[in-house]
Amino acid sequence: MKSVNRICLMMILCCVCCINIAQAAVNPKPFVIPELKEWKGNEGKFIPTEQTRIVYPKGNSELQRIARMLADDCNTLFNHTPQIVEGKGKKGDLILSLKKDKSLGQEGYAIRVTDRIELTAPKAIGVYWGTRTLLQIAEQNKEDLALPKGEIRDYPDYAMRGFMIDCGRKFIPMSYLRDYVKIMAYYKMNTLQIHLNDNGFKQYFEQDWNKTYAAFRLESDTYPGLTARDGFYTKKEFIDLQKLAEECFVEIIPEIDAPAHTLAFSHYKPEIGSKEYGMDHLDLFNPETYKFMDGLFKEYLEGEEPVFRGPRVHIGTDEYSNKDKKVVEKFREFTDHYIRYVEGFGKQACVWGALTHAKGETPVKAENVIMSAWYNGYAEPKEMVKQGYKLISIPDGFLYIVPAAGYYYDYLNTEELYNSWTPAHVGKAVFEEKDPAILGGMFAVWNDHVGNGISTKDIHHRTFPALQTLAVKMWTGTATSLPYNEFNRMRETLSEAPGVNQMGRIGNAPGLVYEQANVAPKSRTPHREIGYGYRVTFDVEGAAETPGTELFRSPDAVFYLSDPIRGMLGFARDGYLNTFSYNIQPGQRLNIGIEGDNLSLIHISEPTRRS
């Protein structure tokens, strides 16, 4: 009997061991941002070869376009362009196709990795998102680009997943906006709101509205002279940006903010500025105000090929005075007028939440209107839903970045957001997850402090980790499985997007990235730039330099041996000139070290003399 028991025990142990071996062989869920909703792991890997083709269905021009984009991205990331073919796939191919599946929704997709990769979706947008997933998995295995065998089903919790950037107070170059579209697409973020006009605070400009900075960033033929001179977008540039975004399934929502934040308009036409509430408010009782704003919106909305190409336009409407009932009713009338005005051009209107702050009797259209729910004191979310508005969750207490301002966030608290937030949390108002009244979420950068030295690179250093984190929370919602620390470590293994390196990362670990014994005039390094956490050292022998003599130059910055104003060591970026209290005298031989990080100005170590 003991022998029988021993045999049974050995058989049980053998079975358990076999089960454990089988379980160990099943591939775990691959890391992707946003995290995959469903994963069924199998055994083994699919390793692409030189013969791997991208196959799309015969006659489907949209999937052909997506196949071409995928091939180009493979070339950018992996230095190989797969062949693109039409028709049926075979073993070793990556096969794109459309397939009805209601459970995947409008943007979902499915991937099956066996001896081939089959990517299917109900719509082309889902196929495109699926290609982003494949690229992210492959770029973590650059030696062989291996993809784990298994099955993916992935779909978003929320339809609008986005970012708003204030280009009014600080000019953001078009090249950066184009890169940001690519970054958003790589992380399945699909909405970019561009805030086109705003102004600084009067108290920082000698309490004088005439001296207070203000800008409108878009070329205007209707009002020549309105457009900012220190940086603007031509109509063609803005149209081309939207076309690029459309190719990547990202929607651009242009915002012309009124009737507050409008100092740029009253600088141009002083009679429409409010004498009572401040020149950054439009005079809502002046008929000329409406003529001006009608003309401005019309310029970008009319015609068969309007400047504002997308389905939605944001009309602003935040932070106007509610000093008395009369102006509140006029504000509500203004809001209703411009909702209907942009709808007259076939656009869906978006507004900032303000109707609790401006509570009144004058009706404001709610049906088919999207409200950016930013502060519950201005618009109580659940009351706004009762009135019929659809909401974008963009609570200021969680999702506002105001660089180096000392209020709101300099960097978002990504750990708290990852662990606790979804778009269902609109400040203290909490909705059921995936409540149809909540269309999605956004985070925002506001450049409140005009001229504070913050550069576009500084802004990006703040937004990129936030985007990676919020991409998860707006797509995957509460279904995350990785602990935050693991997510935060793994997110750094992914690039920003194919061909995009705004962070200036070189390699995956600290170390020497470039060394040259002698640097000849006009020579070039193999690196466009290096990001924060850098140190550059060099030996130099001084000469009688003329002001403006450059030592280094990149597309984004210049470092001067002799700056153009004082003849000192210094650097310029984004229109700011920063100088050190040091210059190199003729005949001096020095070793100079320059360091820069994300929280302080670039600084120079004490130069040491070289013999």
Predicted regions and their residues:
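Trp-centered recognition loops
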Residues: 581-593
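Active-site neighborhood of glycoside hydrolase catalytic domains
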Residues: 278-368, 375-377, 381-382
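Flexible, acidic glycine-rich loops studded with aromatic residues
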Residues: 363-369, 376-518
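Bacterial N-terminal signal peptides
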Residues: 8-18
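Acidic, contiguous N-terminal accessory segments
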Residues: 10, 22-156, 349-358, 365, ...
